[in-house]
């Protein structure tokens, strides 16, 4: 089964939905301790607390290496700052999905418009292109 990491997980809705809909294990990383508490409560109420975990911490310092899918809903500047960490920690072939915001020069594999929102999908490459290695 997939292990979804949601970076900047907020109230946990993405992780909880993945667990409820697909039976995926999920880990949310969120810096705001109040949102982490809320996410844990939401997971209990949704009946998926055994599948999900919410960690309070800085997403730039988190170990995300076990992720088989990563989701983001972060500003473009944050996405771009995070990009080298994604390349360093994730295995080639791992999908990265961002809601509304792109990754600058890293062109997505796929872009989908959903009810006025844009969803971007990338795949961690075998080799990092030279223009993206910073």
Language-model region placement:
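Gly/Ala-rich phosphate-binding loop of Rossmann-like dinucleotide-binding domains
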Residues: 19-23
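C-terminal substrate-binding/active-site "lid" region of AdoMet-derived donor-dependent transferases
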Residues: 77-134
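A short SAM/SAH-binding and catalytic strip from SAM-dependent methyltransferases
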Residues: 65-81
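Glycine-rich SAM-binding Motif I of class I
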Residues: 12-16
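Conserved SAM-binding motif I beta-strand of class I
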Residues: 25-30
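Conserved class I S-adenosyl-L-methionine
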Residues: 2-10
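S-adenosyl-L-methionine
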Residues: 37-66
